[in-house]
């Protein structure tokens, strides 16, 4: 099924989730995916994407590191995706900017359930000095919006 043109009726789901998908899609496609996600979400539903962090939230070194991967690993949409402002794309798809969310969470597989649960419970992973940083271990950048 094409994520830009879903076959589901309006207001079908409480959650729309993707994992490491959007950076494989051109910008115009991402805008359509977000609009479709909003369409199929029920009121109060959540659109959430686990993805690469945006360049605006990376140190110059970390941005260079990911840019290198984009240019030399056959990833044509990787850098353009990271140049986007996720909150702006959500807004353009019709999501309320006040309902935008972003988190950096540790990988449950790397750190274990206890550390993961503590990070989720704290709900402070949006701190700008943590968001998008490439650190020891595996951490995932997540963003989205409530409908």
Give residue spans per PLM region.
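Core SAM-dependent methyltransferase catalytic element
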Residues: 91-147
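A short glycine-rich, Lys/Arg-flanked "PGG" loop and its adjoining helix->strand segment in the class I
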Residues: 31-43
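A short SAM/SAH-binding and catalytic strip from SAM-dependent methyltransferases
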Residues: 14-28
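A short acidic, Gly/Pro-enriched loop at the edge of an enzyme's catalytic core
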Residues: 4-16
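Class I SAM-dependent methyltransferase SAM/SAH-binding core
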Residues: 1-5, 32
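Active-site micro-motifs of SAM-dependent methyltransferase domains
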Residues: 5, 23, 27, 54
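C-terminal alpha-helical "lid/dimerization" subdomain adjacent to the S-adenosyl-L-methionine
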Residues: 48-112
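Active-site proximal loops enriched in glycine and acidic residues that flank catalytic Cys/His/Asp
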Residues: 2, 17-20, 51, 102-104
């Amino acid at each position: 099924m094409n994520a830009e043109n879903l076959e589901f009726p309006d207001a079908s789901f409480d959650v729309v989730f993707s994992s490491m998908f959007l950076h494989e899609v051109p910008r115009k496609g991402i805008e359509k995916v977000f609009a479709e996600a909003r369409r199929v979400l029920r009121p109060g539903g959540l659109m959430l994407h686990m993805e690469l962090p945006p360049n605006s939230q990376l140190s110059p070194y970390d941005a260079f590191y990911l840019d290198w991967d984009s240019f030399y690993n056959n990833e044509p949409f990787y850098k353009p995706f990271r140049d986007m402002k996720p909150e702006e794309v959500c807004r353009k798809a019709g999501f309320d900017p006040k309902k935008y969310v972003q988190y950096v969470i540790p990988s449950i597989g790397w750190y274990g359930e206890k550390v993961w649960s503590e990070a989720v419970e704290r709900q402070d992973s949006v701190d700008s000095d943590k968001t998008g940083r490439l650190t020891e271990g595996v951490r995932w950048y997540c963003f989205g919006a409530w409908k």
